[in-house]
Amino acid sequence: KKNIILAGALTLMAAAISACAPAGSNSNKKGLEAYQNGDYQNAVYLFKQAITQEPSEDAYYCNLGQAYCAQGYYEEAIESFTQALQLGGSSFYSYRGMGLAYNGLEEYEKAIESFQQAIEAAGSLDSSCRLDVVGYRAEAKMKLGDYEGSLEDYNELIEAGYRLRDIYQLTGNVYLLMDDVDQALHCYQECLDIDNRNYEGYLTMADALKKAEAEEARKVVLNAALEVIPYEAKDWCYRGRIYLELEQTDEAFSAFEESYNKGYAQAGYYLGYCYELQGKSEEAINLYQEQIKHDPQDAGLYNQLSSCLVRQGEYQDALIMIQKGMQLADESQMADFLWNESICYEKMGNYDTAIEKLMSYLEQYPADKDAKKELAFLYSR
C-alpha cells in the first residue's frame, strides 16, 4: 500500500501522515510533504500528477480527497474518495474522508453514514483509528441535533479512556446544547482536573457558556483560570485574555505588557488591542509599526495594523498594509485580509470594486453567511 493521509482525531487535532506505509511515487511523496506544510493547492497538483503516473493506485485518490477537504472543496473531495473506493482499496480512510467532506457540506446524515462505514471497515487497524471516527460521528450527531446519540458516542470514548481532556470538554458542549449547565460544568471540571493549565480550554469553555447565555457559569470558569499561577511569558498572555473576557481592561493590559516584556511577541497583538479599547489608537498603531520593524515577515502584524486602520477610517493606509500582508499570509490568514480589503473599498464608496473583492472572497470561503449578506447589501447600494 502507498502512503495515505490520515486526518486527525476530532476537531481539535491536526492532520497527520501514516507512518507505517511504504513510500509511494515521487509525486505522491512530494504531495505528502506539501500537505504537511499546509500547501494544499500544491498538494492537489502533486497528487493529480501521481494519479497520472499510476491511475490505478487508490491511495493517491484518497490523498487527493484529503487535500481537497483541507481547501474546503468538499464535492471534489467526495469524488476523489469515491474513486478510491471504486478501485477497491483505502476503504477506512476513504469513508472517513467522505464523512469529513459531508460534514463540511453540512450534510450530517450522510456524514454519519460514512463514519459508520469507516468504523465497520476499521478491521485490524489500531483502535485509535476507529475511536477517531467515533469522535467525528459524535460531532456530526451533535450538529444534526441528535444530542443523545452524540453523548452515547462521547461516553464510549470516555469509557475507552480516549483523549479524555478533549472528550470531556466536547461532552460538556453537548450538555450546554441540551440546556444542562450543571452537567456541562461537571464535564468541564473533569477536563480541567486532567490539565488545569489548559488555558485554551478555559477560553473555549467560556465561549461556549457565553453562547449558551450561562453568564454565571462562564464567570466561574474564567475565575478558575485566574487561580492558575502564570510561570512563562505565554501564560501571562493567556491571563490577559482571561481578563479581557471579564472586561477587566486595566488588568488585561498589565498582563499583556508583562508577557510582551518577557519576550512573547504575540502579546503585542493584544497589547495594541488594549490601547484601542482605551481610546489610544495612535499608541496601538505605533506599537504595530514598531513590531513590524522587528519582524517584517509576520503577516499577523499587518493584519492587526490594517484592522486598526480600518476601524480608524484610514482606508487608503489600511489597503497598503493589506496588500503587504497578503504577500506574506498563509491560507489561514487570507480570509481577514480579503474581508478587510472589500470593506475598505465599500467605505471609500467604490462599490463595484468592493463587490468584485467580496465575490473573490466568497469563491474561497463559500460558506461565509455574513459575506453573502454583505454582498446582497452592496448590490442594493
Predicted regions and their residues:
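Start-of-helix register in tetratricopeptide repeats
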Residues: 25-26, 59, 93, 128, ...
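Canonical tetratricopeptide repeat
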Residues: 29, 63-66, 70, 97, ...
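Residue-level recognition of tetratricopeptide repeat
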Residues: 32, 66, 100, 139, ...
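Register position in tetratricopeptide repeats
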Residues: 36-37, 70, 104, 143, ...
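Short coil turns that delineate tetratricopeptide repeat
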Residues: 55, 89, 123, 162, ...
